Amino acid sequence: MVDALREARRVLTPRGILVDVRPVTAPMVVEVVIATRAIWATEVSSSVGAEDNAAADTAIQYALSCEWFVFEKRHPFNFEIYCDTAEDLKLYARMHRRMRAAEIPYEALEVRLCELSAGRTARLRCRRSWILSSYRKK
């Protein structure tokens, strides 16, 4: 990672911006949503990515200590995925490493979705916290 930051420093213009966007190492929240209101939620544990985040944090700290970049700002946000069924969520998760490793109870989610919809249009919303940080090249 330090090599990647060194290369970013090399190619950035003076005072150019380095953007670091990654998920927070925290449980995802899966909700049953009707209209815009969550009517039920559960947390899904996923420790995949914790080592990646730690390595990235270490590399960033090294780059800051070498004064390659100056921290500018940090902005937390939620990334949300909407699915009509638990099977749709399962198909999406198969394509993404961090979600693939999460212990998502698909069958239980589908049962809960059917129970709570009661004829209304209900969807699953998977919400994960992310951080966008920016650093300026010195």
Predicted regions and their residues:
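Long, contiguous hydrophobic alpha-helical segments, chiefly transmembrane helices and signal peptides
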Residues: 8, 20-22, 82-83, 93
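Conserved short hydrophobic patches within well-ordered secondary structure
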Residues: 13, 21, 32-33, 50-62, ...
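Conserved class I S-adenosyl-L-methionine
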Residues: 17-51
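Conserved Class I S-adenosyl-L-methionine
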Residues: 65-138
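Exposed alpha-helical structural elements
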Residues: 32, 39, 59, 88, ...
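Acceptor-substrate binding/catalytic loop of class I
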Residues: 41-58, 75-81, 97-102
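Localized chelating/binding microdomains
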Residues: 36, 61, 73
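A short glycine-rich, Lys/Arg-flanked "PGG" loop and its adjoining helix->strand segment in the class I
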Residues: 2-17
